[in-house]
Amino acid sequence: MTQEIQPGVFLHVLPTEKFKTVRFMIRFSARHTKDNAGARTLLTSLLETNSQNYPTQTALSSRLAELYGASFGVGMAKKGNLHQVNATLTLVNGKYVGDDALLAQGVAFLREVLFAPNISNGQFDEATFQVEKENMLSYIKSFAEDKQAYASLQLQQLFFKEDADQ
């Protein structure tokens, strides 16, 4: 089944009877640059926290609970010179809870959080933005304490010193 959830953005569903859960993963890929990496990372936290219809983290969590304890997350990955933003939703297969509309509700939830973020006047909610920005800065500062992550970062800097976008 293929569904267009936004112009130019398609959802492909591969039906199977093997699992009792349904997992959606939506991936947005773009070229990785030094200038966009921080903004994209912050964006993942902002999208994961709230949206227009779920303006607080509590409201978003309540909606996930209504979807039979669905789990949702937005993260990022780097593959070669691509920077990927991945949104994942996992929910129980509706046939096991007698809710045939659950799949459509899951798609609607993803559409809401991805395409109706908590923005007004062209800006993210200020309080949410500040909290997530501070969280990201704290995470970056903690790298020096994680010796394995710090060593990996230093290795990347040595290896890619000629390519500023890496």
Which residue stretches match the model-derived regions?
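N- or domain-start disorder-to-order transition segments that initiate the globular core
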Residues: 1-22
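M16 family metallopeptidases and their MPP-like homologs
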Residues: 14, 20-32, 58-112, 148-166
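Acidic/histidine-enriched alpha-helical segments
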Residues: 116-140
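Short, polar/flexible loop-turn hinges at active-site or ligand-entry regions and domain interfaces
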Residues: 50-53, 94-97, 116-125
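Active-site SXXK
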Residues: 40-48
